[in-house]
From Swiss-Prot:
Keywords: Amphibian defense peptide, Antibiotic, Antimicrobial, Disulfide bond, Fungicide, Secreted. Antibacterial activity against Gram-positive bacterium S.aureus (MIC=40 uM) and Gram-negative bacterium E.coli (MIC=2 uM). Has activity against C.albicans (MIC=46 uM). Expressed by the skin glands. One of its GO terms (cellular component) is extracellular region. Its main location: secreted. The lineage of its organism: Eukaryota, Metazoa, Chordata, Craniata, Vertebrata. Belongs to the frog skin active peptide (FSAP) family. Ranatuerin subfamily. This is Ranatuerin-2Cb. GO terms for biological process: defense response to bacterium; defense response to fungus; killing of cells of another organism. The keyword Flavoprotein does not apply. It is found in: Secreted. Coiled coil: none annotated.
Length: 27
């Protein structure tokens, strides 16, 4: 559904952010 797809998208962005922080990059 639309809600689940949105949730997956947000989770993906969050995951990318965590990986970025672990790598030591700053937005």
């Amino acid at each position: 559904g639309l809600f689940l797809d949105t949730l997956k998208g947000l989770a993906g962005k969050l995951l990318q952010g965590l990986k970025c922080i672990k790598a030591g990059c700053k937005p």
